[in-house]
Amino acid sequence: MELLHSINDFNEAKQVIAGGVNSPVRAFKSVKGTPPFILKGKGAYLYDVDNNHYIDFVQSWGPLIFGHADEEIEENIINTLKKGTSFGAPTELETTLAKEIISCYEGLDKVRLVNSGTEATMSAIRLARAYSQKDDLIKFEGCYHGHSDSLLVKAGSGCVTFGSPSSLGVPNDFSKHTLVARYNDLNSTEECFKKGNVGCVIIEPIAGNMGLVPAQKEFLLGLKALCEKYQAVLILDEVMSGFRASLSGSQEFYGVVPDLVTFGKVIGAGLPLACFGGRAEIMDLLSPIGGVYQAGTLSGNPLAVCAGLSALYKIKRDKTLYTRLNALAIRLTQGLKKSAQSYNIALETLNRGSMFGFFFNENAVCDFDDALKSDTEMFAKFHQKMLFKGVYLACSSFETGFICEPMTEEMIDLVVAKADESFDEIIKGV
């Protein structure tokens, strides 16, 4: 396999696009490689400008549960496109999509459509602060909630210290109200509650940006109880896990009903769409009814709404979809682990529905500190081997992989065989 055209394209892109990419992870920096420049996608496959094709486990970082260029979704988008791309006015499609989302998630009375997960979490936090009338928020190490300033923070020397910016350009004043707790650690979380005037807590119930690390059930139930004890708004960030892990997102596994929730990715089926929602008494604080301002020129645009609605209709029609996707994810993760073990390579694997992850780590990963102990050099070698064997994996050991509906057992078995070849070559130093 060669990437000559991709190398040339990347060099050209770096002359006119900052870093050569429009989202940092796409640069393949952490795996010391060159990103293939993609020409098209179809089903489970990506095709690049060098005429290479790959089985794609990134799926645009999660949205494409039905794979690339699904014919039904594509046809509906084209029909909607002919009527106009954006109106900046209400449409019936928006109401229909809102009803479909609400019907799948307990405790969800109303939603507001936005364009990205970052907008959704940013707006949900603003709304939660207004409702609680308290400024401080708790987030968790390793959980990613978009790139708004108050959420780009990391823990200091201890989990109960106020956050400090982890990105240049973020003033301390923007992050001083953010406290960072240890994921899956209730003691750390309660210390944050005691230290600050906490109005809301935001968490990924199934974390996807430190690798795949699900919350422990007793932890999430305990977190809900702490929010009730300290009268704080609980926000579940299901931008990644919503309609991915199951039809009801994390609720399938935990049964936790939040005050607010955010969705994205799958509900846009590959077009820019996200939402936040929750109890009516909180959501009614939003303008134009209440005093919490949130707006967007392209929010609820008909193309994205149509794509998302088409995906949700397909999901609801297919009663065995999540069972099949889960089975494929288990087949993949178990196959990878068995192969690694045969070469005495430490590998921890897991899945939640169609989401999967693996760590080159001797122990189970329960939080961000555990994830950081993983062998990232081994991951980089493995990633490059697999890429050149036609398997497109997330280009960071701290990302999550995704199964899509067009994938088959035969594809999974082929990928496991290629992983076995890769492990063999790594051990032999080839």
Swiss-Prot record:
Keywords: Cytoplasm, Isomerase, Porphyrin biosynthesis, Pyridoxal phosphate. Its EC number is 5.4.3.8. It is an enzyme of class 5 (isomerase). The keyword Cytoplasm applies. GO terms for biological process: protoporphyrinogen IX biosynthetic process. Its cofactor is pyridoxal 5'-phosphate. Homodimer. NCBIfam families: hemL (TIGR00713), PRK00062.1 (NF000818). PANTHER family: GLUTAMATE-1-SEMIALDEHYDE 2,1-AMINOMUTASE, GLUTAMATE-1-SEMIALDEHYDE 2,1-AMINOMUTASE 1, CHLOROPLASTIC-RELATED. This is Glutamate-1-semialdehyde 2,1-aminomutase. It comes from Helicobacter pylori (strain HPAG1).
